[in-house]
Amino acid sequence: MPLLSLQNKNLFLEISPEMGASITKFCDRKKNKDIFRPFPKTKKITKNNCYFSGYFATVPYFGVIHKDTFFYNNKYIKLSRTHPLEPDTIHGEGWVKKWKVKKQTKTSAELIYVHQGKSSFPHKYQACQKFSLNKTSLNISIRLTNLDHLPFDCGIGFHPWFNISAESKIFSNNFSFIENNKNNFKQKKLTSAKLLNLNKHKID
């Protein structure tokens, strides 16, 4: 499956529908600098190599499901492991599945993934992800539609890897990050603007 290329006068974006609708390249054209981590030329486009991309989305849940099992609606739900490098299931199905291209223009693309609910996550749903370039910004939106006859809880995550350097910074008035270990997750407020900077690119 070919890669999708979007661009305007400032930015270039490359997406792999086959590899979980992940971003393989996102760069500043004028400065010739990568904003997201570029996909290595030594790696092949396969579903498990999305870990080496610059971004993927997580649907219908984000994070680790320990022991591949969770309790919901008075019963235990057993999930399949999503990635061979992970000891537990993680991040849902979307990041390791093929997505279909619904629409594409020079500066935008819309991709769809449908989970039938017959294996792993037990409910049927459709995820629609839209990428669009607007001047110096990349906008990503995800819409998840319940196609099942039963309601279910879900969570959507955006998982980028920024191409940073020792001088990198993030400029934000309200930024937090999740620190996790085997036992729990802790959300921390960023008190210093000197953590990251995305190679001094201004990213919205």
List PLM regions with ranges.
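Beta-strand-rich N-terminal accessory domains
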Residues: 1-80
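Extended, loop-rich substrate-binding clefts of extracytoplasmic carbohydrate-active enzymes
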Residues: 5-7, 71, 75, 80-135
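Short, well-ordered beta-strand segments enriched in hydrophobic/aromatic residues
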Residues: 10-15, 129-131, 138-146
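Short glycine/proline-enriched turns and hinge-like loops at secondary-structure junctions
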Residues: 16-19, 121-125, 154-155
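Acidic (Asp/Glu-rich), glycine- and aromatic
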Residues: 27, 125, 139-171
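Glycine-rich, pocket-lining loop/helix-strand segments that form or immediately flank
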Residues: 34-52, 77-98, 169-180
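Hydrophobic small-molecule pocket/channel-lining residues, especially in calycin-type beta-barrels
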Residues: 36, 94, 115-122, 148, ...
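Active-site/ligand-binding surface loops and adjacent short beta/alpha elements
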Residues: 151-153, 161-204
